[in-house]
Amino acid sequence: MTHFPVNIASDKQEFDPERWAKTPTTESSVNGENGTAPTSGLPSRHPSTGISVLIVGAGMGGLMTALECWRKGHDVAGILERSEGPVYSGDIIVMQPSAVSIIRHWPDMLHDMKAEQVHAVVSYETHDGRHIYGPTVPSFNDPEHLETRKGPFVAPAQVRRKFYRMLLRQVARCGLRVEYGKTVKSYFEDEKDGKGGVIIATTGEAEVRVADIVVAADGLKSPSEILIAGQHVPPRSSGLSIYRTAFPKDLAMQNELVRKRWSDSPPIWEYWLGPGMYLGVFVGDDIISFGFTPRDDIVEGTATESWEPDTDPETVAQAMLSGAGDWDPAVLALIRSAPKGAIVHWPLLWRDLRREWTSPAGRVVQVGDSAHSFIPTSGNGGSQALEDAITLATCLQLAGSSQRAYLGTKIYNLLRYERVSCAQKMSFVNSQLKTGTDWDAIWKDPAKIRTRFPKWIFQHDPEAYAYEKFGEAFAHLLDGREFVNTNYPPGHEFRAWTVEEVWRNIADGKRVEDLLDGDWS
């Protein structure tokens, strides 16, 4: 079997800060005015807080935490990553404006993102080729939402590899180094000394690292859960899984049916909706990506939470045909054009959200998937991880000193928990929209098929919100004064919920969207 090269650790020295101290703005040889090299610019740093921050995990949430902590005046004591080098897993991602508005402060990343994001249109089809709606744009780019937006224009799609490399370049330009091959096996804190720490797995004597604040950005099943919650949160099956991949467009265009449908197409993101399943197809200038989401009773075999690309394209095609025998032939041809060794089969597992994301003394704090997992089809996991990073760095800045840094983590947790809980519930809304489609309603008003991107999510500014609410949150934690978050749906009366509760409603034939109180639009 010929394997497509994905999920392989790349050169760990490529982003050494010494290589990026005086480089052009982008990877490409873009010229500045009159043929000169463009200048590279770092944002102004806020005054030093004296707070040392150790970050575990060099995914997008961890890297953005490092960048924003650097900008806010904290001392980034290290970025530890268990992989042996950068790993470019994943394919096409959605980044919502709330997460990337902060890039307006970063000139290099602003330039890179504008140059590299994909201006695709979005279209919706039935599995057998009947057109439903589109071409259109994500609702966050409807004209009425663009006039007052801060930060860069946000295209419908980001190529994950390019977005991730943009963050790695910026980290290097700030003089920060990712330490690869560092597997953290446990977290601890010392309340008396006001420190958090980690123990790194080694073949010899254990390596210990400490800082005022330790940020666990190491994803699902982070060892930090043991310190914070006492145990790992068990996952629950959603009854769905996803096959996903990305590969060079040229490979797919060797097939006549694929060429006939997509060879002259501008960049497009299509959703093909079938009975109890759907397929997302992204066709860009140089890559093709797809994600097929069936019910578990349609497929054979068991998916595992691993980005190991070990699924044969024909397995995906047969799973599609077992659920519906009349798929559009061009779609099946596209699936079969994927190279072997490039497709991941990932279970869509849910984990009930924990209220606490910090250790008892507040010296260890979680961001991203380690705090709150989102299923890969949510279109919101990366955005919420970046919102976490921005909020945490700002709260630490407002805490003001290493002695009070623990208050910053506690306030960050208070500001984020309810918002993330509501954002997770939107994942159910969008999943049900595509796998349990109300066709009578859709054919009467096809625009209702659009993926839901709520205003309360994409119009949020996490940095401004932290500045606005820090004082109230501080008073709440110290004196018990009333505190109300305003970063979730207007009019919604927040209450905690469980995955089991939502699935019980779905099993009873209820639509999650119909059960929401307040304005979730």
Curated annotation (Swiss-Prot):
Pfam families linked to this entry: FAD_binding_3
Native species: Emericella nidulans (strain FGSC A4 / ATCC 38163 / CBS 112.46 / NRRL 194 / M139)
Pathway stated in the Swiss-Prot or TrEMBL entry: Secondary metabolite biosynthesis
PANTHER family according to UniProt: FAD-DEPENDENT MONOOXYGENASE MDPD, MONOOXYGENASE
Protein name (database record): FAD-dependent monooxygenase mdpD
Disruption phenotype: Impairs the production of monodictyphenone, but still enables the synthesis of intermediates until emodin.
Co-factor requirement: FAD
GO MF annotation terms: FAD binding; monooxygenase activity
